[in-house]
Amino acid sequence: MKNIIRILFCSVLLVWATNIKADVQFGVGGQMGFVNTDGTETEGTAADTSDRSKSIEEFFVGADIFIENVFGNGFTVGVSYIPFDIEMGSGDRLDVDGSDAAENDNGTRTAAADLTDFYTIYGNVPIGSNGVYGLVGYHFATVAPSVSLNNSTYGNVDVNGYQIGLGKRDGNAKIELAYSDFEDIGISATGGNTNSVSADADALQLRVSFGF
């Protein structure tokens, strides 16, 4: 349902912008960069109520499709969608608990998380007359965790974020450097224990795109 709302919101924005004189472009983009994630897992078992924290930096390469309205003064409003998952990080650890069988939760635990269903609403604000512009954007995405716990699972959670950057347009081609910061998230396990995870992520990326 939230994905449908995102699509409808983006569509309404573009329809509104199209009613003003503008050049509508479809295109593809490619990006690469780094995503940094700081996460903390809080154990909720009787044998262990400790916190475990970890910071992970992942290099990523991706692609997107977009539609945008380019106005006569260079101001641009658009929507992009990344049809691939972006890995936020992964790791593992070996748990060795006490001898109490009721509280024993031994074994290797693995964890990973991806950003999926990634939409961005953005605007390009011209700076001068040489094609340079400021970039502002707002992200809509879903965090999909994959964690191995005995009889427990973590569900997906929706996350939003903002983006700022600088770019340069040359005809239908653009290159831009942007920083993204995502809101803090909290996920509680369901099933065998009451573990919870909190995380914060940000990203720095270089993107090249071409419109048709």
PLM regions with names:
Residues 38-51, 87-100, 141-158, 185-196:
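Outer-membrane beta-barrel translocator domains and adjoining extracellular loop/strand segments
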Residues 25-27, 74-76, 120, 131-133, ...:
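Membrane-spanning beta-strand positions in outer-membrane beta-barrel proteins
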Residues 20-87, 140, 211:
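Short glycine/proline- and aromatic-enriched beta-strand/turn motifs that initiate or cap beta-hairpins
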Residues 30, 61-69, 79, 121-127, ...:
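Residues on the lipid-exposed face of transmembrane beta-strands in outer-membrane beta-barrel proteins
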Residues 1-25, 212:
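Cleavable N-terminal export/targeting peptides
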Residues 30-38, 81-87, 117, 127-129, ...:
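Transmembrane beta-strands of outer-membrane beta-barrel pores
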Residues 53-63, 113-119, 153-162, 169-171, ...:
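Residues that define the transmembrane beta-barrel architecture of outer-membrane proteins
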Residues 23-27, 34, 166-172, 199-212:
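Outer-membrane beta-barrel "beta-signal"
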